[in-house]
């Protein structure tokens, strides 16, 4: 059985683990460290990843870090604009998306955040392969619980670029809960609160654990808050102190800021175990040495508003789960920033003096849980402890569609257990409207303009009638938290669907190929995999389009019964083959498609020869995927300039 690893790709540090022989092994890197810095550096001669990259960050402005803060975001996002002030590397705007600009081997290069992320993943994969002595293809990857749909999609993309088959994306606090609960044999249901405060993200989740069932009740957090924000407060404090003492402003000098930031991070860590620490940096700026000190009390004062804000998501998860804080049996702290004594005290005080559980390593807990889930999903049935685990996670944000007047109509509410599927019926807004624009949003606000647009698609060819068409919209959220949305016009069976992929934010094939070429590894394999997936998707789309076509009543009444049965048998055979051969080669998928076409084409030609209308929906007769006129240039679809559907009471 091929091994599957668990990867925790943190904002500042990453960790990889494997579950085998009934125990977890956190895999050390080539430096012997169990956590690897999430840094990648570019020089005139090479690319450095991990410890080697972080060790030269003060000298090399071409060192990229905190790429996770940019994942799935737009260049114009306030968070991205704020981060740019602290980064030594340049962020540029390409099509509304942030690109990281560096000098590599004497040339200017642009990387996407997911491209940088894939380099860390490939590094963790190589560390695991070196340790295990074999190839590793499968992984469970963790994300902050509050990552939205597009951030999850981009995370999956980064796994693909790294040559990994991402078995599942799981939420970081949920993974930590597995780490906590794996060996717990307590009888009865226990309410466990996981507080995960890392370098750049913050999550709080409340779970109930009972006899191996881990059920997430609620989750809250901030995907842009963590230890780096505490570092920024220290950096700003010392920049002002330097200005006050020496009448010079070092904030415009990138190298001086990088050296100061490194010293501030070290000081922050020291203050978790000491009441005071000193900072000594020789020739920090214009030949001036900077020697100073800071106490834990002063650090806590600088960050007091940030520290206090960590309790807001805690209150929210308890409120959402309808659980009183006195009913929480255990509080588990995860992430390096939870080592800060003030945060531990705030948590303890909030829970009326209850001490947090410190039985698991806060730096390794997430990778630990991911490794357990990887073993389960890869079919490891050798362990009794993993055989008894069932994981029930939730959707972090409400998702729905825009209805008349720009109203957000949620179909799946936040904290709904996933995977889940929900359908609701709507009608057209205007009389004789030939099409509808389905716009999918994510968020908690009442107006769609205040929520996040995930994607949109059109459903056209609707019979003209005043408010009569019944359009069933279905949302299907998978176990990764990624969505499929479909719409069906019930009268004539017109259908269309979308996988919410945030296309504008994702990598094009050319960008993926360029990154693979620059990484100088596995280019041929990844290109072959992309075309294999394309062939698989093509066959799948063709088979299902054919199935929809012969189910159409207009086609059904004119199609010869024996022909229909023959075609149905061939389609069923193809779909069954697809289910059992997901890893087949491109040539095998193409051969299956030719075989299906050889049966379908003569039958459909005969049907059209007998007077069947091309508008009946034969695959390829119209728009993409066998939905005639559904794409650009089809019938008027209501346009982009206003809401086109309303809810049916």
Swiss-Prot record:
Keywords noted in UniProt: ATP-binding, Chaperone, Nucleotide-binding, Stress response
Pfam families registered for this protein in UniProt: HSP70
Region annotation (Disordered) ranges: 614-649
Biased composition (Gly residues): 614-641
Alphabetized GO MF terms: ATP binding; ATP-dependent protein folding chaperone
InterPro entries xref list: ATPase_NBD (IPR043129), Heat_shock_70_CS (IPR018181), HSP70_C_sf (IPR029048), HSP70_peptide-bd_sf (IPR029047), Hsp_70_fam (IPR013126)
Stated induction or repression of this protein's expression: Preferentially expressed in yeast cells, the host parasitic phase (at protein level).
Family listed: Belongs to the heat shock protein 70 family.
PANTHER family in alphabetical order: HEAT SHOCK PROTEIN 70KDA
Entry protein name: Heat shock 70 kDa protein 1
Organism per entry: Paracoccidioides lutzii (strain ATCC MYA-826 / Pb01)
């Amino acid at each position: 059985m091929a091994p599957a690893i668990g990867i925790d790709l943190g904002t500042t540090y990453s960790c990889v683990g494997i579950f085998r022989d009934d125990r977890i092994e956190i895999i050390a890197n080539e430096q012997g460290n169990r956590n690897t810095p999430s840094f990648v550096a570019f020089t005139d001669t090479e690319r450095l990843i991990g410890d080697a990259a972080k060790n030269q960050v003060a000298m090399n402005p071409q060192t990229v870090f905190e790429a996770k803060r940019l994942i799935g975001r737009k260049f114009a996002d306030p968070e991205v604009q704020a981060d740019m002030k602290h980064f030594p590397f340049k962020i540029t705007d390409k099509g509304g998306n942030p690109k990281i600009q560096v000098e590599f081997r004497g040339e200017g290069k642009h990387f996407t955040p997911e491209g940088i992320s894939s380099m860390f993943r490939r590094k963790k994969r190589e560390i695991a392969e070196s340790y295990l002595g074999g190839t590793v293809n499968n992984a469970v990857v963790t994300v902050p619980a509050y990552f939205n749909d597009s951030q999850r999609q981009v995370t999956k993309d980064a796994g693909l670029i790294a040559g990994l088959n991402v078995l599942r994306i799981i939420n970081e606090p949920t993974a930590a809960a597995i780490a906590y609960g794996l060996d717990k044999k307590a009888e009865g249901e226990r309410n466990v609160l996981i507080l995960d405060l890392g370098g750049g993200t913050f999550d709080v989740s409340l779970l109930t654990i009972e006899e191996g069932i881990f059920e997430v009740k609620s989750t809250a957090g901030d995907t842009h808050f963590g230890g780096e924000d505490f570092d920024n407060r220290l950096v700003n404090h010392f920049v002002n102190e330097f200005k006050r003492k020496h009448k010079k402003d070092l904030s415009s000098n990138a190298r001086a800021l990088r050296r100061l930031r490194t010293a501030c991070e070290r000081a922050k860590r020291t203050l978790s175990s000491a009441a005071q620490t000193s900072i000594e940096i020789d020739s920090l700026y214009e030949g001036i040495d900077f020697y100073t000190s800071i106490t834990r009390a002063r650090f806590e004062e600088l960050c007091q508003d940030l520290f206090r804000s960590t309790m807001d998501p805690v209150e929210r998860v308890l409120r959402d789960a309808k659980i009183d804080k006195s009913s929480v049996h255990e509080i588990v702290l995860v992430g390096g920033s939870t080592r800060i004594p003030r945060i531990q005290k705030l948590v303890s005080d909030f829970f009326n003096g209850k001490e947090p559980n410190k039985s698991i390593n806060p730096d390794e807990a997430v990778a630990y849980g991911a490794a357990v889930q990887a073993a389960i999903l890869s079919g490891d049935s050798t362990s009794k402890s993993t055989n008894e685990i069932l994981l029930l996670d939730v959707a972090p944000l409400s998702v729905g569609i825009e209805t008349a007047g720009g109203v957000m109509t949620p179909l799946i509410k936040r904290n709904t257990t996933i995977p889940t599927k929900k359908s609701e019926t709507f009608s057209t807004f205007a009389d004789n409207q030939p099409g509808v624009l389905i716009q999918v949003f994510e968020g908690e606000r009442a107006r769609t303009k205040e929520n996040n647009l995930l994607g949109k698609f059109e459903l056209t060819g609707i019979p003209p009638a005043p408010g009569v068409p019944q359009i069933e919209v279905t949302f299907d959220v998978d176990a990764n938290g990624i969505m499929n949305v479909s719409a069906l016009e019930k009268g004539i069976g017109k259908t269309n669907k979308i996988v919410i992929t945030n296309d504008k934010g994702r990598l094009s094939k050319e960008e993926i190929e360029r990154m693979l070429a620059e990484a100088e590894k596995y280019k041929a394999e990844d290109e072959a995999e992309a075309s294999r997936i394309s062939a698989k998707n093509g066959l799948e789309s063709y088979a299902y389009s054919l199935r929809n076509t012969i189910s159409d009543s207009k086609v059904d009444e004119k199609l010869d019964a024996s022909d229909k049965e023959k075609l149905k048998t061939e389609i069923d055979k193809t779909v069954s083959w697809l289910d059992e051969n997901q890893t087949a080669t491109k040539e095998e998928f193409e051969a299956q498609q030719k075989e299906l076409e050889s049966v379908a084409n003569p039958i459909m030609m005969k049907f059209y020869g007998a007077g069947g209308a091309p508008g009946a929906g034969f695959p390829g007769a119209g728009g993409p995927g066998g939905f005639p006129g559904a794409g650009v240039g089809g019938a008027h679809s209501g346009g982009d300039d206003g809401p086109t559907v309303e809810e049916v009471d």
